[in-house]
Structure formats: C-alpha cells, structure tokens
Amino acid sequence: MGRNTRKRRTPLATKIVAGAAALAVGGGGLVWANFYASAHEDHGGHNRTRSAGAQVATIDCPDVGQKIRDVPDRARGEVDGELATMDSQITNAYQRLATTRRAQAGDSQFVQNTILGPLKDRRKAIIDRIQLEINRAGGKADDNLDELAGCQGRPADQQNGGGQNGGGQDQEGNDDNGNGVAGPVAEDFVDINDVRPNSRDSRNGLAADGDGGSTGSFTTDCGVNENNLFNSDNLIAAPGVDNGAHHTHDYVGNQDNDAFSSDEDLANADTSCQNQGDKSTYYWPVLRLQDGTQEFDANDQGGGAEGNIGKILKPAEAQIRFVGSRQGDVVAMPKFLRVITGDAKSFTNGDANANSSWSCSGFEDRQVTDKYPLCPEGSQVLRTVNFQSCWDGQNIDSANHRDHMAFVQEDGSCANGFQAVPQLQIRLAYDIPAPTVENGQVRNPYAVDSFPEQLHKPITDHNDFINVMDEDLMNEVVDCINRGEDCQ
C-alpha cells in the first residue's frame, strides 16, 4: 500500500508540520511505548508491563477548537494552523509522559512540573495568538479562552461524558496487549451477545428518515479504496497542515484528498465513484489489526511513529446512501459543504459530539458506542454512522467545523434556523477474526486509528464528508428522495 502523492502547495499561512518523534523501536517497527509502564514482568517470552492504578495514563486538555466562534474568514487558515500546533503539543506532551515513567515513580510532582505546567504555558501562548489573529481580522475573540490553557493527567479508566460501559484497564491493571502500544485493552471489547438490543443511548446520529415525509434514497458506489489512497491529513479540520490528523485516513470518492487540496482541485479530480458526477470525498480513520504487520506507514507520523500500528483493514463493503427526512422534503446541499461527524477526541472531550456505532452483521439491533464488538464466526464487524442533516442554510463550514450543521431531533425534525438536507448514512463492513480476550489480556486486537493520547478508544470513531457532487446530480438526489424512489 502507499499513500497519495502530495502536492506540497504553500497555503495562505505557513505550512505547519504537525508531528512527534517515535518513542521506541519494537519488533513491529517504530511504535509507542506502553503508556502505563511502571514495572516490567516477563510472561511467555513477551516483555509485558504492569500498571500502577493511580498512575497518569493520558493527558486531557480542553478542546479549544470547539469553543471558538465567529472567526472572520480571512483568519480561518491561521486559526486552524494554530489549533493544529496545539494538537502537536499534546502529542509531544504525551510522548514525554510515556517515556518518563521511572522519573514519575520517584517524584509525585514530576508530571505537573515537567509536563503539564510547561504544556499550559505553551498553550497559553497559542491561545493569545489566536485571540490576536481573530481581533486583527475584525472579529471579537472570547476573552475567556485563556481558561482553556491548562490540561490534566488522568488514568485510562476515566472516560469523560459517561457511556454505555466503563472503559480502561481490567481490574488487575493489565494493559499491554503484547504490541507495545497504548490500547486497546481488554476492557475495550464486548461480546455482541452481551449487548442489549436497542440500547444505544445517544442523541447524536439518529436516522432522519422514516415512514413519512421524503422516503426515497440515493446510493452511490465508490468502492473500498482500491486505489490505496491514505494519508494522515484532515482537509476539513486542519487545511494546510501536514499530518493534521495524527492518524491515517481511508478515502473513497474524490482522488485529490490531502491537506493542500483546494475546492478547485476537488472539482477537477478523478473519482472512484461509479457515478462520475459524484466527486465528493468520503473518509474515516482506518481500522488496523495489531498483528505485528509493518505497514507502509510503520515509520511515519500518523502511523507507527504515533502508535497506529499493524495491518490496515479495508472494508469488505462500503455502503454510502443519502436518505430523506420523515418530517418533509429535503433541499439540496451546497457544493463544497463540509461535515465532520463524531469526535476524534471524545475519550477526553466527552460524548457531546461523539457519533460512534459498532455492531456485528446479524446483530444490528445491538449497537455499542464505547466498545469494540466481538463477533461470532461468519459475522462481520460493522461501523455505521448517520451524519448531521440539518443545515443552517448559509454556510459550507464554520469556525469549529460543526455549528453550520446539526443532528436531527428525536422526532426527525431540524431545530429552528436549520433546514433538512439529504442525510448521509455510511455502513462499513469488515472481515476481522475475533480477538482473543483471556485473563484480562487481548491478543491480536483490532482498533481504530487515533490521536496518541486517545488510546484507540472506540468512541473516538468519526467520519468526514465534503460534497463535490455536480449540481445536476445533487438535484437528482433531492428529487429522487422527495419522490420516494430508491435511486443510484
């Protein structure tokens, strides 16, 4: 496999390289040292680590990007770049946390004095620059952003915002799956038979369609990334920033996807979709099987150098559908509309923006948000998502990349000030052998790529979409849905 060829164009702001050094060299290439490491024990030829229950496992920082509003257009690029630098600061602080366990054991103030304190100072400097850039561009920056500079350390068994089940270590504190990376752990998995039917309890990701209103659908077949288009950029959240995602994305549809792609590039690109009028970009973090495979990105930022290791698993099927609203007709999406659904930082941010849903084929009435399912033989692992489908009627993006779109309410309606557009629903099916979970350990687990400090938690799953359908095709999609027909 190989990643796409980057164009390396210079954006309005200076290109920012968001990266962190690899921490340790292991049998699978450059990998991250285990985040709990406090004492080592040999077990069956593996150098395992055992955790201390009170030890800091990861770093929890307020998400400044979600608190920013009303950024003038001419400051957007600079602000996005500063936010990407903050992400790199967290990655580097996590690196420091993971490689200083011996010092931490001998000094109860080590984490605060040498990691969290300096991190706060660096974040404060960037927040000051963000405020200056917003004000200089004619906006009014929030004077209280400085309150978000401080971060805290916390053990892995604390997940902000609750969830269906607790996450983290097992009661014995065993955390090393044998691959030397920070997660997943045994407690991140659940037998699908143990999940109660219809128990997914989230206000996000409800289906917009139903028996009434606009009952049609439009299916677009864009393959399963046969062209091996991968990179660790995020064109929506971090335009102009190399490795802005800190994890590898899997792309279908538009074939010109990297941090430096302009709207013109997207419009002129090839597409993997059978309907050549659909040049939209659909992307999500890859799933990997942590089996020791050295992938093409084993030594790269966003890959093995940031703890995302193992064999990349392509979906056996990627079903992409647009559906209507059970409350009435839908209107066309504007071209280049950008939508992020789910939250790549929801392990530390909490579940306010989370939109993960895991299941197994044949068990789709059982959906789980914060666990990976263990599926029986012959059953596929499923990742499903229903995007936000309420548009503010004006903007193709917003300062925090969320405010211009909203999820449907419980009755399928949009809140005041929003109008219904076709809802994007994606269903990814994977052929994955079930990991072995035994005695509080997991062997050959699969996991979603993540920011290093997010510990590969399943609740961090997310999807991204940029609408690049031509006007005729978008009108066809809307007409089909509103007429109650199933088209493709």
Give each language-model segment a name.
Residues A93-Q104:
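Secondary-structure edge/capping motif, primarily at the C-terminal ends of alpha-helices
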Residues P118-N135, D157-N160:
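Amphipathic alpha-helical coiled-coil segments
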Residues Q66-A84:
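Short, charge/polar-rich alpha-helical segments
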Residues K7-T14, G27-A57, G162:
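C-terminal region of N-terminal signal peptides and the immediate post-cleavage residues
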Residues A20-G28:
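Core hydrophobic alpha-helical transmembrane segments of single-pass membrane proteins
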Residues A141-G167:
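Proline-directed phosphorylation-rich, low-complexity intrinsically disordered regulatory regions
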Residues G163, G168-H246, D250-T384, D392-Q488:
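Primary mode marks residue(s) on the alpha4-beta5-alpha5 output face of response regulator receiver
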Residues S108-K120:
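Short, charged, amphipathic alpha-helical segments
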